[in-house]
């Protein structure tokens, strides 16, 4: 592993019951992988197994950035607020690793409450974004408010209350 410049983190161990163990991390481009090997018969074998796992992962998987941190991915109507909408996004970059060639099959979906009522604080969790591949959730993150929406004035709140009642 010391010959692979992409390997940037290693933790080794040995226990009579668990054998030789190794956790290694490696980064190539924007993709980071972690390998965990347990129960190897020797120090050399755990390094060989770990390198094989990392090589396999980098060869057959790719990582994509789906959403950037603090960038709007949805705008939602807000009732009774000093603004009519709130921008929603993720508070950290959302990256997913998929088998090569499967990126186009990712299906993102958002779970957002039907009605949002002010006040809403910046950073407040509003809903979630899920990413599925072949019917399985492979990533999920909270959707947060990227801007605050304060409480509207008396007449705005009254009007929106009537409109919410009318819509229900």
Give the role of each language-model region.
Residues 1-168:
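Domain-terminus/edge residues, biased toward the C-terminal soluble/receptor-binding domains
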